[in-house]
Amino acid sequence: NVNDIFEFANTVDIKHIKELLDMQINYNIAIAKEGLNGEYGVGIGKMLMKCYPNSIITKLKVYAAAASEARMSGCSLPVMTNSGSGNQGMATSIPVIIYAKEKGLTEEELYRGLVFSNLITIHQKTGIGRLSAFCGAVSAGCASGAAITYLEGGTLEQINKTVTNT
C-alpha cells in the first residue's frame, strides 16, 4: 500500500539500488533529449516548449512527450521500463528526474523520488491486471505526480489525494 511504499522510499539503503536508478536516469533522459533534438512524430514536446518555454510543469510534459514520441517512432535507444512497458517507465521517471533537477534537489532526494514513483506505478498495476483497456501510462503519470508531492514533503494524506485525483 501507499503507506508501505512511503516508508520504504524513506528508509531504503540507496546504495543497493543506485546502479539501477542511474540506468533509469541515463537511459530515459537520453531518449527524451533525442526526441527533442531529432525528428520524431509530430513534435509535441518541441511545440509545447515553444508555447510555454519558462514553465517547470511544461518542461516535465515536454521531456516525457519527446521521449514517448521518439520511442513510438522507432528510435533505437534503450529505455528503462516499468511493469514491462517503456512508456510507463518513461512516464514514471522523466517528470521526477526533471523536477528534481529544476528544483536543485540532492541526488539522494532524486533517488528516493524515483523509488517512490516506480513502486506506486507497480502498486497501481497490481489492481489493473495483465490485460486491460486502461492505459498503464496513466498509472505512471499518476505515480510521478505522487512522487513530486512526496519530494515536496507532502504528507501521506496529500500523497493519497494526489493518487486519487490524478
Where do the PLM segments sit?
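Fold-independent oxyanion-binding glycine-rich loops
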Residues: A67, I94-Y99
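Generic structural marker for isolated residues within well-ordered, non-membrane alpha-helices
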Residues: K61, V96, G145
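Acidic-glycine-rich active-site phosphate/pyrophosphate-binding loop
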Residues: S55-G74, T106-K125, Q158
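Hydrophobic alpha-helical bundle architecture
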Residues: Y99-R112, I122-T166
